[in-house]
Amino acid sequence: MRVSRLMLVTLRDVPAEAEITSHQLLLRGGFIRRVGSGIYAYLPMMWKVLQRITTIIREEMNRAGALETLLPQLHPSELWQRSGRWQGYTAGEGIMFHLEDRQGRELGLGPTHEEVITSLAGELLRSYRQLPVNLYQVQTKFRDEIRPRFGLMRGREFIMKDAYSFHADEADLQATYAVMDQAYRRIFERCGLEAVPVDADSGAIGGAASQEFMVTAEAGEDLILISDDGAYAANQEKAVSIPDAVASLPPAALTLLKTPGQTTIEGLCTAQAWQPGQLVKVLLLLAQLEDGQQQPVLVSLRGDQDLNEVKLVNAVSRRSEQGVLDCRPISPDDLQRQGINTIPFGFIGPDLADKVLADASSWTTSFLRLADTTATELEQFHCGANAEDQHRSHCSWGDLGGAPQGEDLRKARAGERCVHNPDARLQEKRGIEVGHIFQLGRKYSQALDCCFTNENGRDEPFWMGCYGIGVSRLAQAAVEQHHDDGGIRWPAAIAPYEVIVVIANNHDDAQTDLGDTVYATLLEAGIDVLLDDRKERAGVKFKDADLIGIPWRLVIGRDAAEGTVELVQRSNREMRKLPHGEAIGELLKALRP
């Protein structure tokens, strides 16, 4: 391809909309163009990158025994209502675009395909003899993100590879899950990415075991915690650790203290000379449940710990035996709208009585009470007294009628000891999620009543797995992990072109003739090569070559008459002057070993 025919439009200035380096470089390099909020056009070079990534994915999925298919993007609402996810995905802050057809039937634009594929499996896979089956597709997905940002990292339209496997039993599911784990590791390695597999929460997809693949990068939205012995890694949403120990309070009688204006942990500790880890703080939240209930939640937590919102939502879901659409802090304005005026924020204790909710106009009138283990393990502690400007000192759970059941609701933090090895410590890194694999179990097959006949002649729901890769996100993650001050440094396996031939001076016949010769030779050898034949200054061409990040640059310059060229490797900027035939040989050795 000649650059003069490529529709290459590069930008010198950083677009104001682009917050992170990879987004800036993809816009500046002419790879993508913004069409609307969270909506991007993939321009010719970007499309080549995406095709190269997709080719690697297809090869590894096929190697793993998966079958490629293509599923509809329009989903009848009935399927999602049967699985119980329609309201969660369309109401409030739900992420599914939905519409009505001219007959008034509700449809959703697919953000994921569990319902559709499970329904099809139930119709087509009737016997255990047909199992296991693993189906995958590469397709555009749609999600109505509340805050689209970072270019392709969090868009409203994106390309994804999603796969779904069906099994007769859990052991077979686990075997395929292990095969897919290895396939994913090979995919990311072949794409030239350092991707860390981490334990993860299953989120709205649901299921039992789940693992994310994170590309480590400073701009990553996810915080991952990795043990310094290399044996454990988890997304902070899922991570567990041993919290730092705190000094126990010396035994003493319960005391009621006046604490005017001391509504924060910091304020209390300063005024009373207390340690944060010796307090039990109480958080009030409101959970919106799938059946429409608005459930007040009271959470007790040790004063030096932070609440993990994902663990909280999972705990509420387990206790209520249904999905949670939203869970947010209760504010004084919320209380006023409910007609409740009796809750003293800043002075709440773990034993706040349910009667304070008696006048609530639309909330459930009793608290769902949860407590983190760090709080329940304290023998004595300081806490609120449920009265304005008052706290209790040297309180025990016995004073409050007994300790609630403790569970892990806290955020694990860097520097804390590891559960698997107390001698190891957690370290913190930022990551970009590029892949996620799940053991779904029977969640969807049971909800949709999709069964096969087992070897005993009885109907049984499928065991299912789900495996996703964000294809367009992976491309941008590669840029985030591989760039320098000059621009992108594409890994060779996914670069839009393997070599760029730059003619420094198009007015020099020796340079243009040699450039055409080298270009033709590389094409004949099967190299995907770009020829910069523009009538631009050499400096402009060199800057553009650095910006778009082609792995190898072959410069035809002032030594063209002698047949000498410059061979430059983009990853390390190493330059060698070589006879053009030798330079071509070096390229073939590197690219076609």
From Swiss-Prot:
Subcellular location: Cytoplasm
Enzymatic class: ligase
Entry EC no(s): 6.1.1.15
GO MF terms, alphabetically ordered: aminoacyl-tRNA deacylase activity; ATP binding; proline-tRNA ligase activity
Keyword Protein biosynthesis (UniProt): yes
CDD domains: ProRS-INS, ProRS_anticodon_short, ProRS_core_prok
Coiled-coil features, chain-numbered ranges: none
Catalysed reactions, as listed in the record: tRNA(Pro) + L-proline + ATP = L-prolyl-tRNA(Pro) + AMP + diphosphate
Keywords in alphabetical order: Aminoacyl-tRNA synthetase, ATP-binding, Cytoplasm, Ligase, Nucleotide-binding, Protein biosynthesis
Short name of one Pfam family: tRNA-synt_2b
Principal cellular location given in the protein's record: cytoplasm
Highest taxon listed in the record's lineage: Bacteria
GO biological process, one term: prolyl-tRNA aminoacylation
Keyword Cytoplasm listed: yes
UniProt GO cellular component terms: cytosol
Family matches, as PANTHER family: MITOCHONDRIAL RIBOSOME PROTEIN L39/PROLYL-TRNA LIGASE FAMILY MEMBER, PROLINE--TRNA LIGASE
Assembly with partners or alone: Homodimer.
UniProt domain comment: Consists of three domains: the N-terminal catalytic domain, the editing domain and the C-terminal anticodon-binding domain.
Function statement: Catalyzes the attachment of proline to tRNA(Pro) in a two-step reaction: proline is first activated by ATP to form Pro-AMP and then transferred to the acceptor end of tRNA(Pro). As ProRS can inadvertently accommodate and process non-cognate amino acids such as alanine and cysteine, to avoid such errors it has two additional distinct editing activities against alanine. One activity is designated as 'pretransfer' editing and involves the tRNA(Pro)-independent hydrolysis of activated Ala-AMP.
Homology family: Belongs to the class-II aminoacyl-tRNA synthetase family. ProS type 1 subfamily.
Protein's UniProt name: Proline--tRNA ligase
